[in-house]
């Protein structure tokens, strides 16, 4: 019984190798017998080689499974000529993956002007401490010019707008104003309580910006992604009273810098400007507290 089973198994192997007793064995046929069975038609064989990129995880246009033997199934329709690489077939079976909209170019002219304004801030502080008010007034005029050009370019050229710029512009203003107010307070040109109020508000706003950046960052949150200027997650919208407050603060700085040059440091109008600046600073802080989420626009893919 055992011998009969062995004989049947040997006959099956010989038959699969395409030769039987009494025929001349072929080494080529014996080798092909060890390979997987060949598809039932040449169309299936060609389709199997055509689908190899899909097995490797690649997404190529117009590749779909077909069965030439049964005739079932049809290839996915190819895109029309001239549709471009941005078009995509149903199901996302072709075309390159789209670039995330969160990435943007940070090297715009307004952003460079904001960085210039940040760089001028310590220079102005040094000139004020050294009581070189004539040069300080000229450098401050240059910093103010960069602020005006920054906003003008961003409003009139859409390709110069960026989410980074919406945060970098007010950040540059706050750094410039904070250094100027500390320096002018050191020079006894601005009272200490007013400087304390302005810096406290700016510190809270900067902390809020960092918090919003963390909260709007998609998971996994990494330091490289957090500090990547090209990866924008939110766009900030300052309130109207905040814009007015920034203008009033800069006017007070200009008036204080010019006071020792034109000898009106004890003017009553300068003191009225101190009080008005304190009022707009408090109103600006309250506006951010009141509107909160309305000042932040989250950017999504």
Swiss-Prot record:
Residues 71-93 have a biased composition (Low complexity). It is a multi-pass membrane protein. Catalyzes the synthesis of cardiolipin (CL) (diphosphatidylglycerol) by specifically transferring a phosphatidyl group from CDP-diacylglycerol to phosphatidylglycerol (PG). CL is a key phospholipid in mitochondrial membranes and plays important roles in maintaining the functional integrity and dynamics of mitochondria under both optimal and stress conditions. Highly expressed in tissues such as heart, skeletal muscle and liver. InterPro entries: CDP-alcohol_PTase-I, CDP-OH_P_trans, CDP-OH_PTrfase_TM_dom. It is found in: Mitochondrion inner membrane. Pfam families: CDP-OH_P_transf. PANTHER family: CARDIOLIPIN SYNTHASE (CMP-FORMING), CDP-DIACYLGLYCEROL--GLYCEROL-3-PHOSPHATE 3-PHOSPHATIDYLTRANSFERASE-RELATED. This is Cardiolipin synthase (CMP-forming). It is linked to Combined oxidative phosphorylation deficiency 57: An autosomal recessive mitochondrial disease characterized by multisystemic features including encephalopathy, neurodevelopmental regression, ocular anomalies, decreased vision, auditory neuropathy, sensorineural hearing loss, and cardiac defects. Disease severity is variable, ranging from premature death in infancy to permanent disability in young adulthood. One of its GO terms (biological process) is cardiolipin biosynthetic process. It comes from Homo sapiens (Human). Optimum pH is 8.2. GO terms for molecular function: 1-acylglycerol-3-phosphate O-acyltransferase activity; 2-acylglycerol-3-phosphate O-acyltransferase activity; cardiolipin synthase (CMP-forming). The keyword Cell membrane does not apply. The chain crosses the membrane at residues 109-129, 133-153, 190-212, 250-270, 272-292. The gene is CRLS1.
């Amino acid at each position: 019984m055992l011998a009969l089973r062995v004989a049947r198994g040997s006959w099956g192997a010989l038959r699969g190798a395409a030769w039987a007793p009494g025929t001349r064995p072929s080494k080529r046929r014996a080798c092909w017998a060890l390979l997987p069975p060949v598809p039932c038609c040449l169309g299936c064989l060609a389709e199997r080689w055509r689908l190899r990129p899909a097995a490797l995880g690649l997404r190529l246009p117009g590749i779909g499974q077909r069965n030439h033997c049964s005739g079932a199934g049809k290839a996915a329709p190819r895109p029309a000529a001239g549709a471009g690489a941005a078009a995509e077939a149903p199901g996302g079976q072709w075309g390159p993956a789209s670039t995330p909209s969160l990435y943007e170019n940070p090297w715009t002219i307004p952003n460079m002007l904001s960085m210039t304004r940040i760089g001028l801030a310590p220079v102005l502080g040094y000139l004020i401490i050294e009581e070189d008010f004539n040069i300080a007034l000229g450098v401050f005029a240059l910093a103010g010019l960069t602020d005006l050009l920054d906003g003008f370019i961003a409003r009139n050229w859409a390709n110069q707008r960026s989410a980074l710029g919406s945060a970098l512009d007010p950040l540059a203003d706050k750094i410039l104003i904070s250094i100027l107010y500390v320096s002018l307070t050191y020079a006894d040109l601005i009272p200490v309580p007013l400087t304390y109020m302005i810096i406290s508000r700016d510190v809270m706003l900067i902390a809020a910006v960092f918090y919003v950046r963390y909260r709007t960052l998609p998971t996994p949150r990494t330091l490289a992604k957090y500090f990547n200027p090209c990866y924008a997650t939110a766009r900030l919208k300052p309130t109207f009273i905040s814009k007015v407050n920034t203008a009033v603060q800069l006017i007070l700085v200009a008036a204080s810098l010019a006071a020792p040059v034109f000898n009106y440091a004890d003017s009553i109008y300068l003191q009225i400007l101190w009080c008005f600046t304190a009022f707009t600073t408090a109103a600006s802080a309250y506006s951010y507290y009141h509107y909160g989420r309305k000042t932040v626009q989250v950017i999504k893919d």
